[in-house]
């Protein structure tokens, strides 16, 4: 018998009422109302920087961040082959060339793999904090400093993750966030944010997202080719509502569910690698990934995951194709099962997923 899982996202009545108020006001464009600026200020304060710029989606955040850093034609950027494609195609969008490095068993780039991919044309590295895990940023930042590289943090799946007590997105030169439908929070289906300690970077993003506007000019003047990548007032008011309840409801539930999964399955004989969650690298768990030991199964990992899914539980097979052939990444992407930990779930939903995993493992392990 399959279960009916709670949907995600779900918006509370307070946020829905605020959306209605914005609609009634008729001030729905970023430049006609106050909510866009309010959302940016609230997010900047929450993440721990002074500068934040909202954009239309996470892909735009990455693209505009690279252009704001001066990355362009003739440059190379080190990327992971193991992420949603926007984590690398943003480099092409900026006119530069992505160069792929392999990942570690934690699913993410590390300093050693990045070092092997650096050439005389390398100008930056994009570090993806995958699945809500936090990359080992200390050695990466040290390498970048030695080699004169910019560090872009792709935090699309890691809102609220921390490295040595600092939120992801504030460690490198620029941090990029996504508020797409399935993410930790959404601004009504799409949305993104760019943050930086460097006001010049965020001013450049602010200009690029608005057709090349010279920030602060009135009447508007333009000095570069830009784009239309602004959030609407409706999206911003949704973002404010989701941010307000993130630390009190959303993130604690994700972490509690993840801790239960780690206790229950971290030592299971079928699990080869469990997710990284330490005091130094504090995960925020978009999902909880376990890498399975395929040699211990009588079937493929894909077939195993399909069997677990038949119990109606929230597990996920990684669907992204690799963007380059790298051995560690290839071994991970086909053998990883992800457990959703949406805050709308109940403890019983997570317990049912554990039960289904164990049942199928008992039947399908050699």
Predicted regions and their residues:
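Structural detector of well-ordered beta-strand residues that form the stable sheet scaffold
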Residues: 53, 78-79, 99, 151-152, ...
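Hydrophobic/aromatic ligand-binding patch that stacks against planar heteroaromatic rings
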Residues: 89-91, 143, 167, 184, ...
């Amino acid at each position: 018998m399959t279960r009916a899982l709670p949907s995600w996202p779900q918006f509370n009545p307070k946020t829905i009422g605020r959306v209605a108020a914005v609609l009634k006001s008729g001030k729905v464009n970023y430049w006609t109302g106050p909510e866009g600026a309010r959302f940016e200020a609230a997010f900047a304060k929450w993440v721990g920087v002074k500068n934040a710029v909202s954009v239309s989606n996470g892909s735009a955040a990455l693209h505009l961040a690279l252009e704001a850093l001066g990355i362009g034609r003739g440059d190379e950027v080190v990327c992971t082959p193991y992420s949603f494609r926007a984590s690398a195609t943003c480099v092409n969008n900026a006119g530069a060339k992505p160069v792929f490095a392999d990942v570690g068993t934690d699913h993410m780039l590390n300093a050693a793999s990045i070092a092997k991919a650096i050439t005389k044309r390398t100008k930056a590295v994009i570090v993806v904090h995958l699945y809500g895990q936090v990359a080992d940023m200390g050695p990466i930042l040290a390498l970048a400093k030695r080699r004169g590289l910019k560090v872009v943090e792709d935090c699309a799946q890691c809102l609220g993750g921390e490295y040595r007590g600092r939120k992801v997105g504030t460690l490198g030169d620029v941090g990029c966030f996504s508020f797409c439908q399935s993410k930790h929070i959404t601004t009504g289906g799409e949305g993104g944010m760019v943050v930086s300690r460097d006001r010049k970077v965020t001013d450049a993003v602010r200009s690029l997202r608005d057709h090349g506007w010279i920030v602060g000019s009135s009447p508007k003047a333009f000095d570069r080719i830009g784009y239309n990548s602004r959030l609407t007032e409706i999206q911003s008011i949704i973002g404010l509502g989701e941010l307000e309840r993130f630390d009190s409801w959303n993130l604690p539930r994700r972490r509690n569910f993840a801790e239960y999964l780690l206790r229950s399955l971290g030592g299971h004989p079928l699990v080869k690698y469990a997710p990284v969650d330490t005091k130094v690298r504090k995960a925020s768990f978009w999902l909880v990934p376990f890498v399975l030991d395929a040699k211990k199964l009588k079937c493929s990992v894909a077939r195993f995951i399909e069997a677990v899914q038949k119990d109606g539980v929230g597990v996920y097979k990684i669907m992204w194709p690799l963007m380059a052939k790298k051995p560690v990444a290839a071994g991970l992407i086909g053998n990883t099962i992800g457990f959703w930990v949406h805050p709308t779930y109940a403890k019983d939903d997570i317990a049912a997923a554990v039960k289904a995993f164990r049942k199928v493992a008992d039947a399908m392990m050699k």
